[in-house]
Amino acid sequence: QYYLHQCLSPEEIIGRLAAEGAPIQISHETIYQRIYEDKRKGGKLYKLLRSQKTYRKRYGSGQQRRGMIKNRTSIDDRPAIVDQKIRIGDIEGDTVIGKNQQGVIITLVDRVSRFTFATKAKSKHAKGVAQGIINLLKPHQHRCHTITVDNGKEFAFHELVAKQLQVDVYFAHPYHSWERGLNENTNGLLRQYFPKKTNFKKVTEQELQAAIFMLNHRPRKCLGYKTPFEVFYKFGFSSASSD
């Protein structure tokens, strides 16, 4: 139950226990069976399972969000090493918008470690988003190489970000969300803590950071059941996935 309360899936629970060297005599399917048996008896363990479908709400239509951003550099010009996922510091960036366009959360995810940075933006406008990105990554500037974002107008101040952080900013192709698939997936994980209809203006920065702490300390199958925190700060173990 401890791991379920940490929002781990049954598969992640078994994987993490194995990575820690614990003797395991059950499978993740057994955990599911026991959870649903508990439900039939009136128990509430099933409520600890993660939702299978998550959604992101963005402000405005695709046409409203996208436009001609000056001096943008296409993902086509991004160094090949970014796709190889062999170094820390290549970041995917995005924003998540709350109910009725109330409140904006900036999310940044390291492509190798899956380590996530997030903060509430002061506004959904480009300058506020740019400053939020700078504030998040400034303490880690020495480790950052690239940032890849979509073509939303909230990233129009990309040159300010590049100058302040000394990184290269690249833009994915319009409507090619798979080019930032990790960030899209991470935003879905964040929705486990802040569901679709959440008004982000009512979410405190402390509540957001508590959720990000949980994500960064959740063991991931793609990391050999290490956590993003462990990989980001102790990068070098051989079992990191390149998918």
Predicted regions and their residues:
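An active-site-proximal beta-strand-loop segment
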Residues: 76-116
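Active-site beta-loop-alpha junctions of metal-dependent nucleic acid enzymes
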Residues: 97-101, 118-141
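Short, structured coil segments at secondary-structure junctions
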Residues: 164-165
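Mobile genetic element proteins and their domesticated derivatives, centered on retroelements
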Residues: 13, 31, 94, 108, ...
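C-terminal domain-tail junction helix/linker
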Residues: 196-243
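A short, amphipathic alpha-helix used for macromolecular contacts
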Residues: 1-24, 78
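RNase H-like two-metal-ion nuclease catalytic core shared by retroviral integrases
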Residues: 149-151, 156-161, 171-192, 201-213
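Basic, flexible linker segments flanking DNA-binding modules
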Residues: 23-83
